[in-house]
Design a protein with these regions (language model features):
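Amphipathic, Lys/Arg-enriched alpha-helical "gate/interface" segment within cytosolic domains
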Residues: 1-133
Length: 133
């Protein structure tokens, strides 16, 4: 995953296929923890559009990571916006949040209708799922 902090406090995270290894997953969670170490509130914008075939084992690892995050005294993540375009990713997210509720509100936007020009267009014209902590 690539973390783009140029619009901080909005942090865009773009996934290209993976994670495909434990090392990639660990890099992802370490970047997330670095944001917490800054002790500044932020919002994630996850772009999973290019994610094709992530391994199911990372759903369990992600739920364990969320559980670990919940032990933090202060939650710096204010909300997550997740862009998806496949049912597989949606099912994996549903499974993660069934096992472990999120640390902050999550908004999932299914953008099956192709690329859009802005996040505002996505939010206005996409099917949305909301998950509360």
């Amino acid at each position: 995953a690539t973390f783009d902090k140029s619009s901080f406090p909005i942090v865009k995270v773009v996934f290209e296929e993976g994670p495909n290894s434990d090392e990639e997953f660990d890099n992802f969670t370490n970047e997330w923890l670095e944001l917490y170490n800054q002790k500044i509130k932020f919002t994630f914008l996850f772009d999973t559009i290019n994610m094709r075939n992530p391994a199911y084992k990372y759903t369990i690892k992600m739920s364990q990571f969320i559980k670990r995050l919940k032990r933090e005294e202060i939650q710096y993540l204010e909300k997550s916006i997740i862009l998806i375009n496949t049912n597989k990713i949606k099912y994996m997210l549903d499974f993660i949040f069934l096992i472990q509720k999120p640390v902050a509100p999550v908004y999932i936007y299914n953008i099956n209708n192709g690329p859009t020009s802005s996040i505002y267009e996505i939010m206005a014209h996409s099917e949305t799922t909301s998950i509360s902590p």
